Amino acid sequence: MLATKAKAYWQLTRMNRPIGTLLLLWPTLWSLIIAAKGMPDFDVLVVFILGVVLMRSAGCVINDFADRKVDGHVKRTKQRPLPSGLVSSKEAIVLFLVLAVVSFLLVLTMNPLTIKLSFIGVGLAFIYPFMKRFTHLPQLFLGLAFSWAIPMAWAAQTNELPSIVWFIFVINALWTIAYDTQYAMVDRDDDLKIGIKSTAILFGRFDKLMVGALQLVTLAMLIALGMHYQLGDTFYWALLVSGSLFVYQQHLMRHRDRDLCFQAFLNNNYVGMAVTVGLFITFW
C-alpha cells in the first residue's frame, strides 16, 4: 500500500518524466551563465537547480488538481493518479503546499530582490493550470511561468535586473509557447470534446505555421542576444544546431500525428541543451 502511494506521488510530481524539469532548467542556466559571465556562484546554482525540480513538481501537482475532472476523458491522461483515484484532491493540495514551502525556504537563502520575485513565480505557477478554461492562450501563461526563473536567477547572481533580462525572458516565453503548442496538438481532439482551450485549437490549420514563426523569432532574438554580448562562434554553432532541430520538429509535425507531435515536443530538450552548452563554452 505504501509503495503504491509513493509511486502515485512520484507520478503526480512527474519525477518519472523529467522533460518539463529540463525545459525549465535550460533557460534558468542561460540566465545564470550570462549574469555571471561564466560560472555562477555555487550556492546560487544549487538553489536554482533544486528550485527548478521542486517548483516544476509543484506545478505538475496543481495542474493535475485543476484537471482532475477532465483528465479521465483524455486518452493520454486518464491513468494519472488523481483521475484514477490513487491520490485524493486533499493529498494533492497538501503535496503542492509542501513543495512550494520547501522551494520558498531555498529562496530565503538568496537576496531580498530574489525573494520578492519568488512570490510572482508561485502565483504564475498556481494560476496557469486554470487558464485553459478561460482563454485559448494558456500557453502564454505557461511561457510567463516557465520564464520567471530567468529574472529570479539573474537577481540572485547580481542583485539587479537590467533590461537585457527581460529580453531573455521574452525569448524563452516565445519558445515555450511554441513547444507547448506542439504538446497541445497531441490532445487537441480530446480537448475540443471536453471544452479545454489551447493555442493548438486557436491556431487551427495554421498551427504548424505559427509554431514555425515562433521558433524563427526565438532564433532571431537569440542571434540578437549573441550580437549584444559579442559572443564567439561556438554560440552561433549552437544556434545552428537549434535551428536544425526546429526544422526537424516541423518535419515530425507535418501530418499532425499525435505521437510525432509529442516527439517534436520532446525534441525541444536538445534545443535548450544546445543553447546552454553554447553559452557555457563561449563564456568559459
Curated annotation (Swiss-Prot):
**Assigned keywords, A-Z:** Cell inner membrane, Cell membrane, Magnesium, Membrane, Transferase, Transmembrane, Transmembrane helix, Ubiquinone biosynthesis
Per the UniProt entry, the Enzyme Commission number(s) are 2.5.1.39
Q: Which cofactor does it need?
A: Mg(2+)
Report the pathway entry. Cofactor biosynthesis; ubiquinone biosynthesis
Subcellular localization, per the record? Cell inner membrane
Q: How does it sit in the membrane?
A: Multi-pass membrane protein
Enzyme class, spelled out: transferase
Query: Is rRNA processing one of the keywords?
Result: no
Listed under GO cellular component are:
plasma membrane
Gene Ontology MF terms in the entry: 4-hydroxybenzoate polyprenyltransferase activity
Reaction equation(s) it catalyzes = all-trans-octaprenyl diphosphate + 4-hydroxybenzoate = 4-hydroxy-3-(all-trans-octaprenyl)benzoate + diphosphate
Give a GO biological-process term: ubiquinone biosynthetic process
NCBIfam families under this entry?
Answer: ubiA_proteo
The protein's matches in PANTHER family, at most eight in alphabetical order, are given as: 4-HYDROXYBENZOATE POLYPRENYLTRANSFERASE, MITOCHONDRIAL, PRENYLTRANSFERASES
**Designated name of the protein:** 4-hydroxybenzoate octaprenyltransferase
Q: Which organism is it from?
A: Vibrio atlanticus (strain LGP32) (Vibrio splendidus (strain Mel32))
This protein's encoding gene: ubiA
